[in-house]
Amino acid sequence: MGLAAPKNRSKISNDPQNTTWANNTSRFGHRILTSQGWQPGDSLGASDAAHAAHYTVASQSHIRVLLKDDNLGLGAKRGSERAENFGLAGLESILGRLNGKEAEVKKEEERREEIEKRAFVYRKYGMMNFVSGGFLVGDKIKSRDEVKTETQAKVEVKSEPESDGAKEDDRKKKRKRKDRDEAGVEGEEEPKLKRKKKSMDLRDQAKKDIAAESSKDKKGKKSKKDKKAVTSDPEPTSSGVASPASDPEPLTDKARRKAEKKARKEEKRLKKALKKAAKEAAKPMGDVEDLSSESEDESTPSASRPATGTSTPTVSAAGLTFNPRGMHSVRQKWIRSKKSATMDAQAMREIFMIKTPS
């Protein structure tokens, strides 16, 4: 039925805590519990249980019922988010500091912070109370002091005075162990030093080879320049670098890779140019003339043309027709009207309200 259903109004009783039922001693539950040894005010369960230490006054009191008078869901946060309670804690701390009660204010803030932390843990993980489950080993509970005294007594029994001969043997063993360790360290360091020396020699040799090659290259370049200056024409060349064809020496790997890359790029560029030229040649001359006339018509001011709701198909530079639809057609129409308005001098005067001299 929904909203059309009959309204059943429930009347709130004058006893919301249900104390009449709780105080009624003629109930079956009350009678059977009292026969088992329970009395009003006691908590349920064995009094000598492992978790009996965690019982509080709330365990013996009545269950509290909170009247729901809002549209919040079940388990929603209530009370602290009400408008009348907003900012009261901050105001109290400010007034306390002004009255010279900084220590009390700090304690109160720490207490509130601790409560918030506990509430966060409760919301995220639930209530976590440690309940002792008894002891695994032994029936008697011993204090820490007793355990400490027992361990000290055991240590005293074990530590007996050693003879002088045993002490001397220990010293000899330690000395021998120390000598062996030192010999092992020296033996490990020797191959390391040899390897280091060898690597240093190799580095020096490599440096010498590089220096010799660079000096040889410089000499070769100098002799080439001298030959070129003697045999070259008086006209200045476009680039000072010698061509790879006239270079008698073989190219390095890097230069060869660069030359190959350059040749590939040049080949690609030529292919593209040939393809473009073939396309242009294949196009009929009539299409080209039509395109040029259409572009001229578009460039002239079209103030006299009436604006229609339909979009006209546009021709791209490649000869393909493009018929805009939807958002594109509206935008193209707006661009055309804007272009025509800016190209018309009279329309611009009307927009900017400029009077023409009569």
UniProtKB/Swiss-Prot annotation:
Residues 287-299 have a biased composition (Acidic residues). Residues 25-79 form the G-patch domain. Residues 11-26, 300-315 have a biased composition (Polar residues). Residues 218-227, 328-339 have a biased composition (Basic residues). InterPro entries: G_patch_dom (IPR000467), PINX1 (IPR050656). GO terms for biological process: rRNA processing. Keywords: Nucleus, Ribosome biogenesis, rRNA processing. It is found in: Nucleus, Nucleolus. One of its GO terms (molecular function) is nucleic acid binding. This is Protein PXR1. It comes from Phaeosphaeria nodorum (strain SN15 / ATCC MYA-4574 / FGSC 10173) (Glume blotch fungus). The lineage of its organism: Eukaryota, Fungi, Dikarya, Ascomycota, Pezizomycotina. The gene is PXR1.
